[in-house]
Swiss-Prot record:
Subcellular location: Nucleus; Chromosome
Family: Belongs to the GINS4/SLD5 family.
Residue positions where Phosphoserine is found in the record: S12, S16
CDD domains per the UniProt record, alphabetical: GINS_A_Sld5, GINS_B_Sld5
Biological process according to GO: DNA-templated DNA replication; double-strand break repair via break-induced replication; inner cell mass cell proliferation
InterPro entries assigned: GINS_A (IPR021151), GINS_bundle-like_dom_sf (IPR036224), GINS_Sld5 (IPR008591), SLD5_C (IPR031633), Sld5_GINS_A (IPR038749)
Subunit description: Component of the CMG helicase complex, a hexameric ring of related MCM2-7 subunits stabilized by CDC45 and the tetrameric GINS complex. Associated with ORC2. Interacts with HELB.
Superkingdom field: Eukaryota
The name this protein goes by in its record: DNA replication complex GINS protein SLD5
Organism: Rattus norvegicus (Rat)
Annotated gene: Gins4
Gene Ontology CC: one annotated term: nucleus
Function: Required for initiation of chromosomal DNA replication. Core component of CDC45-MCM-GINS (CMG) helicase, the molecular machine that unwinds template DNA during replication, and around which the replisome is built.
N-acetylthreonine: residues bearing it: T2
Length: 223
């Protein structure tokens, strides 16, 4: 794995900002996105560019293996690494699809009200999937139940019928960058808010919504 991949950030005033990653750094980015997505209660920002670059990298690796000598131990090792990367990639994408199916009306509402310039939580393909899933769900409800009900009951509010992500759930995290003055909400009404510092390398169990912005920025890693 010697190729270098280019990612395009979205924080440049003059367009996309190019970030050059080695293959090892690219796979590390994928694994971080996978772990965060796996343990976060909500759908996180789409990492479609990382997914595309990893798929390109897998194609390059496959081409290199086809040219390599058969029976070489290095070929077997590289093929095992390819299978590991494919597993992480497919698990990451499956996890996102499961969240879309579980929270689709809330995800689409968040996307509709997303401020200009704010990263999307859906890739273009995921957005199409979510829209089609909602349309099919509404059609199924109408055909199976709603059409048999009185006219005043033939509507369903999916925003109320489908549960929201539980942002109050607790998550384990590892601190990658030291953070100061993190406001923590109390467990009970009689308690007061308090402030904590998160030291680099430390691990914590904390309510997700308290550190959600730090997950998005990459300052902490869910574990």
């Amino acid at each position: 794995m010697t190729e270098v991949q280019d990612l395009h950030g979205q924080d440049s005033d003059e367009g996309s900002e190019e970030v050059v990653l080695t293959p090892a750094e690219l796979i590390e980015r994928l694994e971080q996105a996978w772990m965060n997505e796996k343990f976060a209660p909500e759908l996180l920002e789409s990492k479609s560019e990382i997914v595309e670059c990893v798929m390109e990298q897998l194609e390059h690796m496959e081409e290199n293996l086809r040219r390599a000598k058969k029976g070489d131990l290095k070929v077997s090792i590289h093929r095992m690494e390819m299978e590991r990367i494919r597993y992480v990639l497919s698990s990451y994408l499956r996890c996102r699809l499961m969240k879309i199916e579980k929270f689709f009306p809330h995800i689409l509402e968040k996307e509709k009200t997303r401020p200009a310039g704010e990263p999307s939580s859906l890739s273009p393909e995921e957005f199409v999937f979510a829209k089609e899933y909602m349309d099919h769900t509404e059609t199924h409800f109408k055909n199976v139940a709603l059409k048999h009900m009185p006219p005043n009951l033939q509507k369903v509010d999916l925003m109320r019928a489908v549960p929201k992500p539980d942002l109050d759930s607790y998550v384990f995290l590892r601190v990658k960058e030291r953070q100061e003055n993190i406001l923590v909400e109390p467990e009970a009404d009689e308690q007061r808010d308090y402030v904590i510092d998160l030291e680099e390398g430390s691990q914590h169990l904390i309510r997700y919504k308290t550190i959600a912005p730090l997950v998005a920025s990459g300052a902490v890693q869910l574990i």
